[in-house]
Amino acid sequence: LAAVDCSEYPKPACTLEYRPLCGSDSKTYGNKCNFCNAVVESNGTLTLSHFGKC
């Protein structure tokens, strides 16, 4: 099972680094920062499906 440590998020700004992750919502997030901010906004309901594009 893939996992990402989001303990240091949310962050006010994310870099444009492209390292895609696929969320449990079948949406591709550009990088860990974007994904983790979305996880925080979802109150933890969003999880990582896998690394790479959906």
Curated annotation (Swiss-Prot):
Q: Where in the cell is it found?
A: Secreted
Q: Keyword Glycoprotein on this protein?
A: yes
Which sites does the entry annotate for glycosylation?
N43
InterPro entries in the cross-refs: Bifunctional_prot_inhibitor, Kazal_dom, Kazal_dom_sf, Prot_inh_Kazal-m
| Principal location listed in the UniProt entry | secreted
Query: What keywords sit in the KW lines?
Result: Disulfide bond, Glycoprotein, Protease inhibitor, Repeat, Secreted, Serine protease inhibitor
What's a GO cellular component annotated to this UniProt protein?
extracellular region
Task: List the residue(s) that the UniProt entry marks as the site Reactive bond 3.
Answer: L16, E17
Which is one GO molecular function term here? serine-type endopeptidase inhibitor activity
Q: Per its UniProt record, what Gene3D superfamilies does this chain match? A: 3.30.60.30
What domain of life?
A: Eukaryota
Any S-S bridges, and between which cysteines? C6-C36, C14-C33, C22-C54
Q: Name one Pfam family in it.
A: Kazal_1
Whether Secreted counts among this entry's keywords is yes
Domain Kazal-like: residue ranges? 4-54
Cite the SUPFAM superfamilies for this sequence. Answer: Kazal-type serine protease inhibitors
Q: What is known of its domains?
A: Avian ovomucoid consists of three homologous, tandem Kazal family inhibitory domains.
Annotated protein name in UniProt:
Ovomucoid
Ranked from the top, the taxonomy reads:
Eukaryota, Metazoa, Chordata, Craniata, Vertebrata
